[in-house]
């Protein structure tokens, strides 16, 4: 896997999660990633409607890539992991949508959000890979994605959430992101040794 692709994948995940009206341009975000520094936008720039949009997007992103892996994975383990991701994130996304409806919160990504285009590029890139190369790229992406989501939850989203029910939901599902990260790292180690 090329270093350029890994930077691209990491950039698109961070942008998909953190570009929702937060300070900093795409170029600034890419530079932070290249230097290894996590993007840490100011928590006060977020409101609950934007956090709901970020939460929904993070789950949608992994539903899409999980479904792709369930179809294209070259090993049964990767296909099963992809199906698990799609199923888990679909359930959590629905919980978020149900809560947003209950609270009367409309997810509001800002104008100019490029996360859909970034995710489409990730899907195109992964779709062009086959066999063990697909498995490695998918798992590397999942490791980075879950690290980025966990960091965003801990340092950006939780400190900014105003509604206690929304906070409780994010806290409740955070361990699942940790579990997915551990599974992806474990699978990546096994796939890389083949």
Where are these regions (language model features)?
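His/Met- and acidic-residue-enriched segments that coordinate or traffic transition-metal cofactors
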Residues: 2-8, 21-194
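Hydrophobic helical h-region of N-terminal Sec-dependent signal peptides
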Residues: 10-15
């Amino acid at each position: 896997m090329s270093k350029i692709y890994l930077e691209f994948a990491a950039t698109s995940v961070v942008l998909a999660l953190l570009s929702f009206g937060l300070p900093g341009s795409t170029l600034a975000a890419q530079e932070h990633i290249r230097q290894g520094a996590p993007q840490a936008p100011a928590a006060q720039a977020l409101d609950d409607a934007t956090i709901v949009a970020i939460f929904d997007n993070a789950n949608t992103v992994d539903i899409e890539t999980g479904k792709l892996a369930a179809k294209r994975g070259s090993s049964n383990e990767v296909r099963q992991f992809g199906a698990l991701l799609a199923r888990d994130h679909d359930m959590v996304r629905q919980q978020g949508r149900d809560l947003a409806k209950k609270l009367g919160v409309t997810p509001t990504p800002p104008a100019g959000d490029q996360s859909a285009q970034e995710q489409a590029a990730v899907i195109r890139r992964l779709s062009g890979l086959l066999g063990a190369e697909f498995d490695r790229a998918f798992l590397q992406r999942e490791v980075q994605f879950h690290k980025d989501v966990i960091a965003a939850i801990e340092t950006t989203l939780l400190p900014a959430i105003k509604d206690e029910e929304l906070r409780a939901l994010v806290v409740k599902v955070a361990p699942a992101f940790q579990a997915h990260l551990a599974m992806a790292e474990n699978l990546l180690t096994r796939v890389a040794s083949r």
